[in-house]
Amino acid sequence: MNSEMSRNVVSNLKKMNVKLISVTPDAEKNIAYCARVSNPNNQENEKIAGLLKYCINHKHWSIFEQAFMTLEIETTRGLAAQILRHRSFTYQEFSQRYADSSLLADQIPMFDLRRQDTKNRQNSIDDIDPFTKQEFEIQIQRHFASAMDLYQAMLDKGIAKECARFVLPLATPTKIYMSGSVRSWIHYIDLRSANGTQKEHMDIANECKCIFAGQFPVIAEALGWTEHS
């Protein structure tokens, strides 16, 4: 990204993007088939909704490890640190050691500003005065531009990307491929779409939930999920 472009890092709030990369074919049928391993004469039974709901209601979670889904998530380095804590998944993330960070976006997106909840350290409240918010947003935009100018100047002088990246803000965009079993996705979505999760991470989890409901409709219905819930 050239110097002129980096001086104009004035970006609107960026919606996190999540999209499907791959999923086990006939996943729900495969899960039901494997669940009937001890009843081989009934394994070809195509009636699976009742069985999958039974497994969920009685917490027979291991059977949901028989199918997998990979999603692509565009987010920030700050939120990526939260996502990567879910250790039952496997990940590939955009490498700031290998590639120029401006390859993902030529702007660092502005993030939302909310007030700290004094009763819950892991919660924030969206009631900041608009003038206060605007004042800080202007300063943040300048900070982002300065950081990107410094980053590019270091690269131009031959500083290694693995060193120059340390001047970049946590709001810098990144991309993750997140792969896991249906069981892992159920747990992740259930946890991160609930209250107590940072809003931006909750938005990602809800996008994952919509994709999950589209790919695993029988399981989603048994969980009480829909594409829009």
Q: Where does each model-flagged region fall?
A:
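Family-specific signature for flavin-dependent thymidylate synthase
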Residues: 1-229
